[in-house]
Amino acid sequence: MHGKELAGRLRKRENDNDLSPNSSSSPAERFRCPHPECNKTFSRQEHLSRHKLNHWPKEIYVCSYVLPTTNAPCNKTFVRKDLLIRHEKRHSKVKNRLSRPSKDQISSSNKDFSKNAPYNPSEVPLSTQSGTSTINLIKNSVNPPPSITQESKFRPFLQQAQQPQQVQQSQQPQQIQQLQQLQFPQQLRAPLQQPMLQQQMHPQQASPTFPSYDPRIRNNGQNGNQFFNLIFDNRTGVNGFEVDAANNNGNGNDQNMNINPAVQQQRYQDRNFASSSYQQPLQPLTQDQQQEQYFQQQKLAQQQQQQQQQQQQQQQLPPQNPFGDPLTSSSSGANLSVMQDLFSTNFLNSDPLQSFMQELSEAPQVSIEDTFSDKNTIPPNEKPVQQDEGFQNPPVMFELPQDNIKIPKAQPKFNDNPSTSVKDNLSSQKLNINELKRRSSKDSGVGNNSSLNYKEQLRHSMKSVPSFFHPDPLTKYKISKEKCQEMFSFVPELRYVSIESIHKSLKSFWLNFHPQYGLLHKPSFHVDKQPAILNLALIMTGASFLGSEYREQISDPICGPLRWIIFSHADFQPPSKTYIIQSLLLVEGYEKTSTNRYLHERSFLHHGTTIQLLRRTPSLGGHPLMVKTGKTSGENSIQDPQEVYKRWIDFEMLKRIAFYAFYMDTTHAVVFGYWNLFINSNQIQLTLPCPDQVWESYDLSYETLMEHGYGSTKRDENNTFLSALMQLMKNVIQILRNNNIRRNKVNNGGIESTPTDLESTTDWNIQSLFGKKILLAGIISILFQCQEEVNGDYFITNFRGGITDHLGLSWKDILSFAMNYWLHEVQKSCTDPKACRISTPSEETLTNRKIDEDNGDGLCDDDLDLLSSDNPSNCKIPVIHISQIVLRILHHDYYIYAGAPWRMNVPIGRDEYDMISRRILQFAKDPYNGGVAVVYAFQFLFEMFIIKENNVPTVVKSYNINSDPVITRPYAIALTSLLIWSCNFALHGCEVSIWDNTEASKDECFQPDDSNGGNILGNTDNNGSTIANNNLKEKNNYIPIESFEVYLLRMYRNLYVDSSLDVVSFQNDVWAKASLLQHISNTHFLCGMMQFMRDIFNKSYWDLGREFGKLFDNCLERSLGKTSPTCHNMFDV
């Protein structure tokens, strides 16, 4: 009965995919497979792209698993790596679609099941359809001995299969045969106690239905990697780490950990099996053998139609895949989330420039018939493969509907303003299909261009600067009057701004903002050819670096209406144009760091909107207007380099926007204290940004691109963000174990371990500054994911053993070390200008050529280039220091303790303040929490205000808060200063007691009846006024015991950690300084520091900066003896 239902569904699906006259789907809305013998059509282009791999696979992936029953390799082949990974999981008996059955289901299906054997999580339920189906429960009759288990490779924590501790000799093959005949309903679910979790269980301690986990069992560092597998939990199809515990003999210190990053990048190999008969080496298949096996399986699939239909029913994507594994199913949540995650490379076009260079650098194409004619690999009944259908070079074009098809016009879905006509993008998409068809037909008529001579001509043509590049520096900022009029129509206030100020603002953007991130492609940028909205965003951002006057006259008038201008624009409607998202990100950055509190909060509220627009962009969402022709190889894919450059720029720019949104999401959450991330690190499956020397260069010659890795087949395999992040975490674990780092060693007088094996870790050669910063954002994302889990029993129960207890380190210590590792090994420095800004030597040459024209415009680079003139010792990536603090304490606690009347619009009462005070005191007493956080805070202040002149440290006080080119640095200075004051005040109290607290009382400090949190004291009588005036006079006349310069230099001599140390010595030194901090006297002499910070932030144009100024003044008063903790007028700015 069920077989008939399945056959009926398959026939229905085939009819849906059939392009026939009777088909209900309009051909104009579907994509047809270009194979001459295939009539499949698909509703989405990416479905067609996956389906075409069945005809023209780019690579054949072979399963290397050795079957225990036959001692023979599986050798099943797949055309997609994710299918192979999913298939291999079935071998390892992890991530089953179905879980253990309930007691009722067991008894209803077979009453004797409970008598035969208890439930074993290692059993693999198989199912192909809904309803009742046969489930084969395969159980090993003999369990591996403990010695073999220790030497075998650990599986990821979230994918652990059961490994019993005791060998149960009562299990006989006859029982296995009985279990294989059992039938259960398909709708089986895992118990609620274990969401997403399959781990090593111990049946003698567990119930048949709900296995338990004993946290006392320690498997030599296994739980340390279980922690990381919680982070990379395969919800997006990326596995965590695998740990090799080989020949450790119970000594965790000598155990080497081999953590494989991203199983998507590698296949399971070198497995150890319980029986010695399984130890035979597995010979890898050669390329010819893989191809031969591929064609043989094609023939086999055609002869076994029913098996093919079962595979199609389980593997929805791609349709009718003859190489799929019948055990896999795309209905599982993990694999489905991969397809739905629009930040993954499954939906992003492959790098056009990389594909073009690979084809251009390879040898002349040879027909597949000539190559394999002597091997007889093509079955007799198989049609010979044509030259353009070669194994490595599939056809790249797809057919589109005819010109005479009438496309209905959709009605507009949205009008923001009656006077504004917002176009319907869906209608535009359909109207452009004919244009795509004409473009496709032109490309299909191109002859054989892959000859050696033609390739040589292409290589030679690449030596010239592309025609759409604009080497003239004036094209980047000297905007025309016509373009200004277009901007004035959006923001009329700009009419009163001089054209020179607009030019200056644009140039400031390229000098101060662009070198930090490289969002735009500068060589192809021409200011007069950009949309007015993008130009407004660039002017607003550039003017924000030039002082309060430019912010008031230019940035603020643009920022106020610009967000609503973007929201009401036609190009905002999804799928949004790239410049729309670029502009939104720039607006958000300015709103958060340079405006008032209203716009600051508005920016965070609308951050989710930008993320959603990004998820719906053409390249990330499979938009039909983006030509996904699959031109990765083949003759017809070689085309004009100019077109390749344009597609590559669009591809790379959109990827950088996605990364910048992720970077803002994580780093701004750390700096500003927002804890709800919109994007997690395991959702980012994009390749890292291309090298800066390529992105910023006007020279895209063949030789230059080859020098930077383009054309190499290995480039795209190892430069994904997630694989790089996981490799970084692997190195961190390896260094921690090899050096046996323990934080309690610092109590014995400093560094005891000698750093070893640092050279054996990865040599990080990331050639993109922004790519390096993205890895830091990934670590921060892990931090937030850990903090979300830390309060649950799920986290506490399972992460006590292994490396965390064995080395005396918590997960916070591991992440803290990971940040230090990133700073020392990946970024190299957070102060060196060469390491913190993009250098463009090719542009410098072009600028020198145009120096006369530049001078004629009257704009001097020295006055505008604040980033280059920034002190070389200043920290340019403050988020690295703030992250170390957030890892140990939230901003909320010391922000309230310093006197803020409310946080996140929630007023603070007396009870809440008392509770926070106790937490701050406990935190400050702990040297490995409060002490370490304070040491990192001091390191940041040392970098910001101390320089060495002839090796003599000197304090620099000339800091202009309104012209800081690093937008998060003012907030970071305020946070670190407040943390230092809070910890020292909690431990030691005030500096002096000269404040008159006669009229102050604890009850007056907090007024519960005031729902608005105003809490303003009402001392208006003459006595109160006299006391207040006297206190004010005492505060103004007070000379601190130690000025800011004296105090900071004294702390520098005691707490400075040399950043030139290797990462292990640096980490140990930080712990040593944290222990030493408790023995430094008079650390609470902070009145001079509070006066200095108050004066800096009182001059801030930014409203939040002036709020900090009032808060610092409140801290000064409390250091003078004031007992009232709250700064009642903090937000009156």
Swiss-Prot record:
Present with 238 molecules/cell in log phase SD medium. One of its GO terms (cellular component) is cytoplasm. It is found in: Cytoplasm; Nucleus. This is Zinc finger protein YPR022C. Residues 18-27, 195-205, 283-316 have a biased composition (Low complexity). It comes from Saccharomyces cerevisiae (strain ATCC 204508 / S288c). It comes from the Eukaryota. A zinc finger (C2H2-type) spans 31-55, 61-91. Residues 1-16 have a biased composition (Basic and acidic residues). PANTHER family: MIP31509P (PTHR40626), ZINC FINGER PROTEIN YPR022C (PTHR40626:SF11). One of its GO terms (biological process) is regulation of transcription by RNA polymerase II.
